[in-house]
């Protein structure tokens, strides 16, 4: 099992009638069955759950709908604890509380995080950072030093939390009007997150090449009728 894992949603296209069919605006596959998938960084799926509606989700464990699903998938996939596995998730799942729990399990985790889930972490406000130049950043550790939250300004402002990574700064290439390619500061935490997060997308790309079409069942003729 690859040490780098990621959890994300994956869509199976379907245009027939079914109570579990979802519509997600703005996605490459807008109609179909939504799955929560746990994948290795090379695209192999380790575990998945088909989304059947809010009322059919996992038993609440106190981390919110997304966070509970993370714990559920890791448990079903029998991901070993304290073995150096790294998990990358997006802001649907991440909370400081979840990061603490996964740290206690020895699962190193980084994930983009919504402003309402950072537990009043005193970072510079998003509205203020939107006015700053690209590459600006801010960070804070929790009082016990176990959870790091970083906020970075690119075209938009993004926040990311981690229970294992550091706040060191690297650079990334961006294009500026009238200047061409330029280098701007970027937290290495975000660079490592971007490298580790693509397992589900890679699987979707490979599946799309050999996808089988799902047809809606049709009612056959009854020979006794007519």
Residue ranges and their predicted role:
Residues 1-226:
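Acidic, contiguous segments within the catalytic cores of piggyBac-derived transposases
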